C-alpha cells in the first residue's frame, strides 16, 4: 500500500485523477521530498520550493504532454520532473549518467523545450502555438517565466510578437520578488477569477464587436477598462502588448491557481497570468536567505547550508578582490554585471563602491554596449560575465566594442567545463568565437596570482581585452598584492624537457606539469591566446619532435588551432597534437571526472602524448 500521495504519482495523468482537495497535501509531500532530495545531490533549491503549487496546478489543468509547458531557465523544473516519472531518478540529479538539472527534450516527452539560459520561453512557446495553428491542432502552449528573466529584451521581443496574434498562448509570470498583502491578494484573487471567466471574455468580445463601428468610442472604452484594471493590478504594460492580463494571484493557493487556469484554458488570444510566489517556500532557512539557497551543494537539511570555510580562494574571489583593489587605485573603474553579482564575485565591490557598480539585469547585450558608451567618455568598464552568457552579446562585442577599439575589460568566469550544470552553462566555446575578433587581447591564467596579473594587464591595455578563468579554486599559488601587468603576447617556459613541448593554456598548465614529469616534456604557460607568443612557439617548434597544445575549450577554432595556423604562416613543419574539448556537448557531472573523461587530466595527457610519440617516425 502506498505510503503517501506522492508514491501514487508516476505521471500527470495520475495527478489529474486526484480530487482537487488532495492537492495541498500532495504539495506538502513534494516540498518535503525536494528538500531531502536536493540536500543529497545539490542543485537549485529556493526557486523550486517556490514553484511547487504552480507546477502542480499546470499539470493538473493542462493535458501534458499533449499540451506543452516551457520552463524558462529551467532551474525551477524539479517538481515538474518529479511529477513526470522521474521521482526516483532525482537521486542522480546533475550527476554523471543521471538526469539533468534543466529540462532536456531527450530526457522526457514532458520536457517540451530544452532550457538553461533565461528569457527564451515565450519565443519557444509562441513558436509552438503557431505550429499548432498551422497543423489545425487544439493543443495549448504555456510559457512559465520568472520576474528576473523578464528583464531581458528577448522576452519583450516575444511579447510584442505574440500580442499581435490571436494565438491561445499563455504566459505565466512566476513573480517571486513581489510582496502581496492579504487584502490586495484577496481582491486580486477574486478579480483573476472574474477576468479569466468565460462571461467576462464573452462580454469583452461582444463589446469590442459592437464598438468596432465607432473607433473613437471603442478606444475610450478600452482605456477605461485599462484604467479600472490598472487601479488594482500592475498589468497595463502587458495589456499594451496585446495580452489579456490576469492577476496578480497567490501562487501558493491551489484553489485559486486551478480555477484561474481552468478558466484561461478556454480563452481565445494571448493571455498573461501574473502569479506571486515566495522563494524557499516551506523551508525556513531558504525563505530567510533565498540567495544562499539558490544553488546549493550537498547539505544537512536539519542544519542548513554551511558557510564556506576558509581555504584556497576561487578564481571568482580572486577577481572580486582584484576589482576592489584596482578600483581603489583608479577612480575611472566601474564594474558591470548582467544579474550575477554573487556568482561573479561583485558583492564586496557593490558594497565598497556602490556608485561605480551596475547590475543591468539579465541583459548581456545591453551590458556590453553600456560598457562601450562608458568607455567612449573615458570611464574604464570591467564587465564580469560567465562565458556561456557572453555568447548572447557577441554582436555587441564585435560591433560596439572591438570595431571601435574601446578599452573594455571582459572578466570571463566559468570558462571551460562547469560540472553539474552541464552543457547549457559550460564555457566551451569562448576562445573559438573570441580569437577571430580583430584587436581583442585574450588571456588565460594558469593560477590565482597569474589571474590577478592578467586582469591588471587587460585593464591597463588601451583597447578591448578578455581574461577567461575557470569555475572553482586554482592551484593554491601565493597571490602577490600588487597590480603589476605582464607583457602582452608573452608566455613563460615552466619546465624544460626533451622531444615533446606542451603548450598549455590557462587551467591545463597544472595537469600539463604533472604529466610532463613522467614524459620529461617541456611545458610552456602560454598566458595569451591572442596575440600568441610567436618567438616562444618558434623556439619550441625548433627544439622538439612534437608540439602538444592543451586547452579547456573546444578544439575546433581554439587555441590549438591558433598555434597550428601560426606555424603554417611561419612555414614551420612540425607534428602538432591538439588536445581540448571534442566536438560534442559535454554532459553534466563532477567537473574533475568530466575533464578526465575528455582526456584532459594528467594521466589522459600522458596517454595521448605517448601514443602520438610512438606513432612518429624515428
From Swiss-Prot:
It catalyses: D-glyceraldehyde 3-phosphate + pyruvate + H(+) = 1-deoxy-D-xylulose 5-phosphate + CO2. InterPro entries: Dxylulose-5-P_synthase, THDP-binding, Transketo_C/PFOR_II, Transketolase-like_Pyr-bd, Transketolase_BS, Transketolase_C, Transketolase_CS. Thiamine diphosphate binds at residues 75, 116-118, 148-149, 176, 283, 364. GO terms for cellular component: cytosol. GO terms for molecular function: 1-deoxy-D-xylulose-5-phosphate synthase activity; magnesium ion binding; thiamine pyrophosphate binding. GO terms for biological process: 1-deoxy-D-xylulose 5-phosphate biosynthetic process; isopentenyl diphosphate biosynthetic process, methylerythritol 4-phosphate pathway; terpenoid biosynthetic process; thiamine biosynthetic process. Pathway: Metabolic intermediate biosynthesis; 1-deoxy-D-xylulose 5-phosphate biosynthesis; 1-deoxy-D-xylulose 5-phosphate from D-glyceraldehyde 3-phosphate and pyruvate: step 1/1. Coiled coil: none annotated. Its EC number is 2.2.1.7. The keyword Transferase applies. Mg(2+) binds at residues 147, 176. Homodimer. Belongs to the transketolase family. DXPS subfamily. This is 1-deoxy-D-xylulose-5-phosphate synthase. It comes from Thiobacillus denitrificans (strain ATCC 25259 / T1).
Amino acid at each position: 500500500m502506498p505510503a503517501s500521495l506522492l508514491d501514487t504519482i508516476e505521471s500527470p495523468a495520475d495527478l489529474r485523477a486526484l480530487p482537487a482537495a488532495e492537492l495541498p497535501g500532495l504539495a506538502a509531500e513534494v516540498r518535503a521530498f525536494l528538500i531531502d532530495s536536493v540536500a543529497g545531490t545539490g542543485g537549485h533549491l529556493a526557486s523550486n520550493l517556490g514553484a511547487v503549487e504552480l507546477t502542480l496546478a499546470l499539470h493538473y489543468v493542462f493535458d501534458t504532454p499533449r499540451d506543452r509547458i516551457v520552463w524558462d531557465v529551467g532551474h525551477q523544473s524539479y517538481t515538474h520532473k518529479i511529477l513526470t516519472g522521474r521521482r526516483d531518478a532525482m537521486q542522480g540529479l546533475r550527476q554523471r549518467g543521471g538526469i539533468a538539472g534543466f529540462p532536456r527534450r531527450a530526457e522526457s516527452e514532458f520536457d517540451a523545450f530544452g532550457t538553461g539560459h533565461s528569457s527564451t520561453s515565450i519565443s519557444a512557446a509562441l513558436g509552438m502555438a503557431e505550429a499548432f495553428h498551422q497543423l489545425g491542432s487544439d493543443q495549448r502552449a504555456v510559457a512559465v517565466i520568472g520576474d528576473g528573466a523578464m528583464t531581458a529584451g528577448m522576452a519583450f521581443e516575444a511579447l510584442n510578437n505574440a500580442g499581435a496574434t490571436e494565438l491561445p498562448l499563455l504566459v505565466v509570470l512566476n513573480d517571486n520578488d513581489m510582496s502581496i498583502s492579504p487584502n490586495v491578494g484577496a481582491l486580486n484573487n477574486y478579480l483573476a477569477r472574474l477576468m479569466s471567466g468565460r462571461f467576462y471574455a464573452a462580454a469583452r468580445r461582444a463589446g469590442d464587436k459592437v464598438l468596432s463601428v465607432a473607433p473613437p468610442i471603442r478606444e475610450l472604452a478600452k482605456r477605461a477598462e485599462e484604467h479600472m484594471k490598472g487601479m488594482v493590478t500592475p498589468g497595463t504594460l502587458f495589456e499594451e502588448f496585446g495580452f489579456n492580463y490576469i492577476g496578480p494571484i497567490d501562487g501558493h493557493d491551489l484553489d485559486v491557481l486551478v480555477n484561474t487556469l481552468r478558466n484561461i484554458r478556454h480563452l481565445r488570444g494571448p493571455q498573461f497570468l501574473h502569479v506571486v510566489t515566495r522563494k524557499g517556500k516551506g523551508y525556513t532557512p531558504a525563505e530567510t536567505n533565498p540567495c544562499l539557497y539558490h544553488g546549493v551543494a550537498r547539505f544537512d537539511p536539519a542544519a542548513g547550508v554551511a558557510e564556506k570555510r576558509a581555504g584556497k580562494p576561487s578564481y571568482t574571489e580572486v577577481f572580486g578582490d582584484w576589482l576592489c583593489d584596482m578600483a581603489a587605485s583608479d577612480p575611472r573603474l566601474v564594474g558591470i554585471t548582467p544579474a550575477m553579482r554573487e556568482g561573479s564575485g561583485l558583492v564586496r565591490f557593490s558594497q565598497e563602491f556602490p556608485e561605480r557598480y551596475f547590475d543591468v539585469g539579465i541583459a548581456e547585450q545591453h551590458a556590453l554596449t553600456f560598457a562601450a558608451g562608458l568607455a567612449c567618455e573615458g570611464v574604464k568598464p570591467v564587465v564580469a560575465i560567465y562565458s556561456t552568457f557572453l555568447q548572447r552579446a557577441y554582436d555587441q562585442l564585435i560591433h560596439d566594442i572591438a570595431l571601435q577599439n574601446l578599452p573594455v575589460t571582459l572578466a570571463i568566469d566559468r570558462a571551460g567545463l562547469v560540472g553539474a550544470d552541464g552543457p547549457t552553462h559550460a564555457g566551451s566555446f569562448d576562445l573559438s568565437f573570441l580569437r577571430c575578433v580583430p584587436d581583442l587581447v585574450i588571456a588565460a591564467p594558469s593560477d590565482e596570482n597569474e589571474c590577478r596579473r592578467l586582469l591588471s594587464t587587460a585593464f591597463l591595455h588601451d583597447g578591448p581585452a578578455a581574461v577567461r578563468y575557470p569555475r572553482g579554486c586554482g592551484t593554491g599559488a601565493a597571490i602577490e598584492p600588487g597590480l603589476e601587468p605582464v607583457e602582452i603576447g608573452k608566455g613563460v617556459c615552466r619546465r624544460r624537457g626533451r622531444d615533446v613541448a606542451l603548450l598549455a593554456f590557462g587551467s591545463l598548465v597544472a595537469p600539463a606539469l604533472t604529466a610532463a614529469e613522467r614524459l620529461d616534456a617541456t611545458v610552456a604557460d602560454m598566458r595569451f591566446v591572442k596575440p600568441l607568443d610567436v618567438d616562444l612557439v618558434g623556439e619550441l617548434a625548433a627544439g622538439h619532435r612534437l608540439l602538444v597544445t592543451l586547452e579547456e575549450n573546444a578544439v575546433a577554432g581554439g587555441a590549438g588551432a591558433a598555434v597550428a595556423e601560426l606555424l603554417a604562416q611561419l612555414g614551420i613543419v612540425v607534428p602538432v597534437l591538439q588536445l581540448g574539448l571534442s566536438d560534442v556537448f559535454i554532459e553534466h557531472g563532477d567537473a574533475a571526472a568530466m575533464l578526465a573523461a575528455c582526456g584532459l587530466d594528467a594521466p589522459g595527457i600522458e596517454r595521448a602524448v605517448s601514443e602520438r610519440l610512438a606513432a612518429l617516425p624515428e
